[in-house]
């Protein structure tokens, strides 16, 4: 990632979101699994970053965040996402991605 803001992201707090899974993909439970991963990482590290490249992965990330936010609210926690752009290298090719920082507003 090239954003200064995301320089603190570690491998333990970064979730790479797939666009080839989800509603029409191979794994229909992917969004629910991703929402569970968001909560697990957030409660363990107090931070989680979702990295998306492409519309399908962003769609999965938003759906998973909405589910995770609802589950967190049941525990009295309020989560919010802060989006930003990033550049991701795939071999010799660079693509623009979107990073969603999950933060607590408590």
Regions found by a protein language model. Name each.
Residues 1-9:
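Long, polar low-complexity intrinsically disordered regions
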Residues 11-47, 61, 65, 69:
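Conserved mixed alpha/beta catalytic, RNA-binding, or beta-rich assembly cores of soluble enzyme
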Residues 20-22, 53-55, 84-87:
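Short, ordered loop/turn segments at secondary-structure junctions
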Residues 21-24, 56, 78, 99:
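Compositionally biased, intrinsically disordered low-complexity regions
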Residues 55-81:
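Short, hydrophobic/π-rich interface segment
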Residues 73-106:
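C-terminal edge-of-domain segments
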């Amino acid at each position: 990632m090239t954003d200064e803001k995301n320089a603190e992201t570690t491998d333990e707090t970064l979730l790479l979101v797939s666009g080839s899974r989800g509603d029409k993909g191979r794994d229909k439970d992917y969004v629910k699994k991703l929402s569970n991963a968001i909560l697990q990482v957030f409660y363990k590290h107090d931070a989680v970053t979702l990295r998306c490249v492409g519309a399908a992965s962003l769609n999965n990330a938003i759906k998973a965040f909405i589910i995770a936010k609802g589950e967190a609210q049941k525990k009295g926690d309020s989560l919010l996402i802060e989006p930003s752009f990033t550049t991701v290298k795939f071999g010799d090719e660079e693509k623009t991605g979107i990073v969603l920082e999950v933060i607590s507003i408590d």
